[in-house]
């Protein structure tokens, strides 16, 4: 499950690096807490991924500046908990996961309280301006804006349940 989440999220993040400035170390301190995934897109087909809904994601800053991301997602009718550790690099806003196999970036959005990352904002309400900013960033890197997925927000989803 971790590679699947990383394939979905991290490929997007890495592809969007050039659109915005990377978040500084000071800004990274603000990402700890609850975030809501507002939209996502990928650069390849993932037939095994049938994301129906996602609960709010919790980001926690760990010792040494690493980040832990946790969320529960309804995938193909089953709730599955996903946890990923993002390891800080020397470059502000840049992280690696899965022993360096994946590179992740936390990128500043033009919208307040939004980042281009796993999730887009701290509240569950969609912000059309933030979505437009996300679409521009995705389009600038050659990702199809037509394949952007906006998952249904759900408050709870227990692993193993449907």
Swiss-Prot record:
InterPro entries from the UniProt entry: Calycin, Lipocalin, Lipocln_cytosolic_FA-bd_dom, von_Ebner_gland
A GO cellular component annotation in the UniProt record: extracellular space
Cysteine-cysteine disulfides: none
Record bears the keyword DNA repair: no
Signal peptide range: 1-18
Localization terms from the record: Secreted
Entries under PANTHER family matching the protein: LIPOCALIN (PTHR11430), LIPOCALIN 1-LIKE PROTEIN 1-RELATED (PTHR11430:SF124)
Family according to the record: Belongs to the calycin superfamily. Lipocalin family.
Known role: May bind a variety of ligands including lipids.
Name this protein carries in UniProt: Putative lipocalin 1-like protein 1
Organism listed in the record: Homo sapiens
Gene transcribed to yield this protein: LCN1P1
């Amino acid at each position: 499950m971790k590679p699947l989440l990383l394939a979905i999220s991290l490929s997007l993040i890495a592809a969007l690096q050039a659109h915005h400035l990377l978040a500084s170390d000071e800004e990274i301190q603000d990402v700890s807490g609850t975030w809501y995934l507002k939209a996502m897109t990928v650069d390849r087909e993932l037939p095994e991924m049938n994301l129906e809904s996602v609960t709010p994601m919790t980001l926690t800053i760990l010792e040494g500046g690493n980040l832990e991301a946790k969320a529960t997602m309804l995938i193909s009718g089953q709730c599955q908990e996903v946890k990923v550790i993002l390891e800080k690099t020397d470059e502000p806003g840049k992280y690696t996961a899965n022993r360096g196999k994946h590179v992740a970036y936390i990128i500043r959005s033009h919208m307040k309280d939004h980042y281009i990352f796993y999730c887009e904002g701290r509240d569950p309400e969609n912000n059309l301006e933030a979505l437009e900013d996300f679409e521009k960033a995705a389009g600038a890197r050659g990702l199809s804006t037509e394949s952007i997925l906006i998952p249904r927000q759900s408050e709870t989803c227990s692993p193993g349940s449907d």
